[in-house]
Amino acid sequence: MEIRHHLSEELLLDYSSGALSEAWSIAVAAHLSKCSRCRASHAKLEEIGGSLLTDSTPEELSDDIFSNVLERLDEVGASVGNEIRKNSGWASSYGIPSVVADYLAADTKKLPWKNLGLGVSQVVLKTKDKSATARLLKIPAGRKVPHHSHNGRELTVIFSGGFSDETGSYGPGDIQEIHGNAEHQPWVRDGEDCICLAVTEAPLKFSNVAVRLAQPLIGI
């Protein structure tokens, strides 16, 4: 598996410093569990952060800085070190890492998939995050997602299958970061359904009027 699309330096820095909320952190940790290159970059940031902590006086450190750093280390350690244990069943067949599987049922047949139309299904992860939503998506092979833009940032991590859009081609392990009003229309590859994690901070802006009218019902 060759990963071509990686985390931005800004995302890695925010994650390492504990600045990301739960939903965004899940997406970053999911990619880190797949990508050795980004794990190495993350380790360097942690090393730099550790040096800064050592050189700082107690007055310069916030009360929760240590807990933030330790929390990030625990998340990555769990998603990487426990992946075999957590993914010994159905999750491994979809490439879903433990950091995501922990939010899901033990059996894919028991997942509360919600039909969004056109064969697309979702499961919204139950997090405590009030600023962003994380959802597992299943999109049929060969399907085009309706053309849309965004009201904010969107992160998508591919677990199985893949898609292409105006920004490139994405496969297992890749992460796509979309900002602001960027427009695209993902097209899932033929031959295999696409299973991915998508995190958004605001509803999508669909070009098709009918899809926009249905948004309150499908919740995306």
Question: PLM features: residue spans?
Answer:
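Positively biased amphipathic helices and basic secretion/translocation or surface-docking motifs
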Residues: 1-8, 22-24, 33-36, 40, ...
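Short Cys/His-rich Zn2+-coordinating modules
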Residues: 13-22
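Short beta-strand His + acidic residue motifs that chelate non-heme Fe in jelly-roll/DSBH
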Residues: 42, 145-147, 166, 184-190
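Short acidic-glycine-tyrosine-enriched beta hairpin
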Residues: 165-185
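Ligand-binding loop in jelly-roll beta-barrel domains
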Residues: 182-205
